[in-house]
A protein has these predicted regions:
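Conserved G1/Walker A P-loop phosphate-binding module
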Residues: 1-75, 79-81
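Active-site phosphate-binding and catalytic loops of NTP-dependent enzymes
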Residues: 30, 99, 171-175, 198-209
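Conserved C-terminal guanine-recognition region of P-loop GTPase G domains, centered on the G4
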Residues: 51, 75-143, 216-218
Length: 293
C-alpha cells in the first residue's frame, strides 16, 4: 500500500524550521540563517520513496504583524493549518510558549495528528528539557512530543518514521521525480536574499526584496539578471557600498552558492533599485508573490 500526504511545518521565528525542512527533504530547499524572519514564503519540499510521498511545507515564523509584508507571512503560516495531514509544530528549549497564544489556540483545536518538536536539545541539559516537555504538554495536551536537534540530525530519522506511520493510504499527489513546487527563479532570489541577510546588518535585510528579471540557461551555464529592491535611497547606498565593494562581495558569494545549487557556471548581474515602502503596499506585495491565496 502506498502512503501520501501533506506535512506542514509551523512555529515561531528562529526555532529551526527551515533547517529541519532541509534535513527531512535531504536537499537545500529553504534558506536558513541565524536571523529571525528568514523565511517569507510557504515553500514545498517533496520526499519520494517507493511506498510513500511526503509533501512538506516550510512556513514563515509566526509573529504579530507590524506591516503588510508580515501580514502576508502570517497568512502563509495560518494557511498551513488548513490543509495538513500531519502538523509539525517546532519550538526549542529556550522559547517562551506564551508569546503566540492565538496561534496555539488554533493548533490546540486541530483534529489531525500534531507532532510537537522541541528543537536544539544539544543546547540543553536533561532538567531543562524535562521542564520544557512538561510545560508544552500542559499547553498542547493532545500533541505527541519529540525532542530533536535538526542541525545535528538527532531524532530526524525517528521523526520520518513516525510521519510515515501517520500518513493516510493514498496515491502520490505529484510526479515521483518532483522535488518542489517552486520554479528556478524563486530559488535564485532566495539565495541572493540569504547572502544579503548574512552580509548586511540591522534593518537592511528586512527592507530588501529580490526579483529575477532574466534567467537564461544553456547546457553549460546560466545567465541571471536580478534586481535588489530597497525602500530608501540610503539603503541603496549601503547595499552598494563604497565604490560598489559591498554589492560585489555579496554578489560573488551569491554566485558561488548558485553554482553549487544548479551544478553549473553562473553569470550573475545584480542591480539595486528603490521601491518606496514596498513592504506596506499590497500592489507591490502581490507583484513580489506574497499573495497567500
Amino acid at each position: 500500500m502506498h502512503k501520501a500526504g501533506f506535512v506542514n511545518i509551523v512555529g515561531n521565528p528562529n526555532v529551526g524550521k527551515s533547517t529541519l525542512m532541509n534535513q527531512l527533504v535531504g536537499e537545500r530547499i529553504s534558506i536558513a540563517t541565524s536571523k529571525a524572519q528568514t523565511t517569507r514564503h510557504r515553500i514545498m519540499g517533496i520526499v519520494n520513496e517507493e511506498d510513500a510521498q511526503i509533501v512538506f511545507s516550510d512556513t514563515p515564523g509566526v509573529l504579530k504583524p507590524n506591516y503588510k509584508l508580515q501580514e502576508s507571512m502570517l497568512a502563509f503560516s495560518e494557511s498551513a493549518l488548513q490543509d495538513a495531514d500531519v502538523l509539525l509544530y517546532v519550538t526549542d528549549v529556550v522559547e517562551n510558549p506564551e508569546k503566540n497564544e492565538d496561534f496555539l489556540d488554533k493548533v490546540k483545536k486541530m483534529t489531525i495528528p500534531v507532532l510537537l518538536l522541541i528543537n536544539k536539545i544539544d543546547q540543553s541539559d536533561q532538567k531543562t528539557l524535562g521542564d520544557t516537555v512538561e510545560r508544552w504538554h500542559s499547553l498542547l495536551p493532545n500533541a505527541e512530543i519529540l525532542p530533536i536537534s535538526a542541525k545535528n540530525k538527532f531524532g530526524v530519522d525517528m521523526l520520518m518514521r513516525r510521519i510515515k506511520e501517520l500518513l493516510p493510504d493514498s496515491p502520490p499527489f505529484f510526479d515521483k521525480d518532483q522535488l518542489t513546487d517552486k520554479p528556478a527563479r524563486f530559488f535564485v532570489s532566495e539565495i541572493i536574499r540569504e547572502k544579503i541577510l548574512l552580509y548586511y546588518d540591522k534593518e537592511i535585510p528586512y527592507s530588501v526584496e529580490v526579483k529575477v528579471e532574466s534567467f537564461k540557461e544553456t547546457d553549460r551555464n546560466i545567465d541571471i539578471h536580478a534586481v535588489i529592491y530597497v525602500e530608501r535611497d540610503s539603503q541603496k547606498g549601503i547595499i552598494i557600498g563604497h565604490q560598489g565593494v559591498a554589492l560585489k562581495k555579496m554578489s560573488t558569494e551569491a554566485r558561488k552558492a548558485l553554482e553549487k545549487f544548479f551544478g553549473k557556471s553562473v553569470y550573475l548581474h545584480t542591480f539595486v533599485k528603490v521601491d518606496k515602502d514596498w513592504r506596506s503596499s499590497k500592489r507591490e506585495l502581490d507583484n513580489f508573490g506574497y499573495n497567500p491565496e
